[in-house]
């Protein structure tokens, strides 16, 4: 993995892959419908003029947890087989994915452990805990968040939910 600023890592799993099929998108929409906020599409005439096309903005700040990450997290957790849900989930994130996974796990009645950097904003750590997740702090200068998450998942029989590749 390539080390990026702030200890983030670029890894091969982050490379764009084949886009999801329309049927997969429609299935995800059905799964999310009862739980996700239906955020509006807002037109932006000034932006339309600037780029020479109609542009719509989707304010996902209005979504549960304040981010689009809830959608992906909920869809992923919903796909975990019932028998595997007892082990809970483990994720690693500085904030938005952490909160998305924590909120989705709470709704689905699953345990969640979230590996977060010790220097993540206190507000993000507290919101993640507020959704019922266990927050496991690490030192991003000295520790590998993915290794920590894999270790926790292995010990608990939990499903690892990375913030990418799904």
Residue ranges and their predicted role:
Residues 1-13:
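N-terminal amphipathic/basic-hydrophobic helices that include classical n-h-c signal peptides
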Residues 10-166:
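PLP-dependent amino-acid enzyme catalytic core
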């Amino acid at each position: 993995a390539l080390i990026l600023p702030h200890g983030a890592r670029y890894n091969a799993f982050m490379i764009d892959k084949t886009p999801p099929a329309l049927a997969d998108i429609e299935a995800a929409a059905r799964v999310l419908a009862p739980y996700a906020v239906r955020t509006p599409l807002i037109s932006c005439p000034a932006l339309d003029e600037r780029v020479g096309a109609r542009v719509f903005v989707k304010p996902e700040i209005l979504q549960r947890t304040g981010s689009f990450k809830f959608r992906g997290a909920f869809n992923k957790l919903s796909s975990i087989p019932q028998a595997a849900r007892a082990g809970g989930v483990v994720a690693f994130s500085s904030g938005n994915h952490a909160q998305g996974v924590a909120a989705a796990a709470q709704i689905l009645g699953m345990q969640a452990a979230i590996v977060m950097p010790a220097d993540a904003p206190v507000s993000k750590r507290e919101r993640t805990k507020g959704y019922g997740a266990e927050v496991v702090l690490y030192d991003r200068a000295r520790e590998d968040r993915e290794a920590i998450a894999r270790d926790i998942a292995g010990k608990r029989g939990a499903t690892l939910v990375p913030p990418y590749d799904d």
